[in-house]
Swiss-Prot record:
It comes from Xanthomonas campestris pv. campestris (strain ATCC 33913 / DSM 3586 / NCPPB 528 / LMG 568 / P 25). One of its GO terms (molecular function) is tryptophan-tRNA ligase activity. ATP binds at residues 12-14, 20-21, 157-159, 197, 204-208. The gene is trpS. Catalyzes the attachment of tryptophan to tRNA(Trp). It is an enzyme of class 6 (ligase). Its EC number is 6.1.1.2. The lineage of its organism: Bacteria, Pseudomonadati, Pseudomonadota, Gammaproteobacteria, Lysobacterales. Homodimer. It holds the Pfam family tRNA-synt_1b. Gene3D superfamilies: 2.30.29.80, HUPs, Tyrosyl-Transfer RNA Synthetase. This is Tryptophan--tRNA ligase.
Amino acid sequence: MQMTTRVLTGITPSGTPHLGNYVGAIRPAIQASTATDAESFYFLADLHSLIKAQDPARTQRSTLEIAASWLACGLDPDKVWFYRQSDVPETTELMWLLTCVAGKGILNRAHAYKAAMDKNRAEGEDEDAGVTAGLFMYPVLMAADILIFNAHKVPVGRDQIQHIEMARDFAQRFNHVYGQDYFTLPDAVIDEQVATLPGLDGRKMSKSYNNTIPLFAPREELRKLVFSILTDSRAPGEAKDTQGSALFQLYQAFATPQETAAFAQAFADGISWADAKQQLFERIDLEIAPLRARYEALMAEPAKIEATLRAGGARLRARYATPLLAQLRDAVGLRDLSSQASAVGPATAVKAALPVFKQYRESDGQFYFKLHDAAGTLLLQSDGFASPREAGQLIARLKQAEDTTQLQLPGVQLPADAAPVLAALRALREA
């Protein structure tokens, strides 16, 4: 039976989103949440937000607004896992367990931490000025978010790929130190076609440019903002270019292909900017009006949102987080002292039941793996690899090997007698 793919999406609680957030992130994520071949996890990263936001009222308000936004846009908490990061305390306990195997050198190379230090040096400040331990440890908390549910895939932007690689590294280190594959190694999913919208001034829509159109702006405010979009001086009756037109790009993001083609023809026919803006306003409002109504209803009943988030967290803890933490606590030795004598025998027996691949990182920075048989005898040793993914891909190929020729792969130190290796691989396939 094939395992369902678990997909984890983190949501930054940054308040009410704008149209660019909706088109580029929220709408496609909610569409993806309906996939029947995946188990989807969506969480509000309120603990992460504390790294930058230290205004309690703002943190609370932003969390409420972003939760209401996603629910209003169609996220169904009965079909996906929707929860608040701080409602799953096992995440922070796991963070500590990972911290105890994470290399400080890896954290030193984290982009956000390095950027903060570089900025301080450029300004003549002490390189750690204003840099909190929270910023430094951010990648470990992100790894815990992913590994607490053993997510297989994590949709991220290119600037977050490093954090997924770190999560893989921490997971491999833990698996190696404690001799068992407790964690699945997650993969980053990069959407190369992320939609971006132009703002009121033609630049990318961004709060930092102060050129946004709030997603749930009241109807009249929405109309006013649309009519303030920057256009050129071409008069009614004069053909207008769709290329580079913020007005046209915004319309295209909400319209069907047929509607877009008709709008393009209207540009060629010399539609006035006022009429074009009116059409854009009506097309956006057609999609947004029902979402706005749901958002306003949700914001009027914050207790319902609170109940939804708490219920999601409670169900997740029971299903995934609590059982995994119990297993991990036992693995590291945080055990009931009265059961010490009886626990040693069975644990050893279970551990020795099957052959096992062990992945690890050496001091040279390279990633290696070994194959041991059920008794712990070393059967196979790899060469070093530049990334954990390369090592993992080779292990996957080895697990399918059924004869000696299939074992002859670059990066594998094959023993003279390959029969024990093939027997071990067969045992793993049949397990």
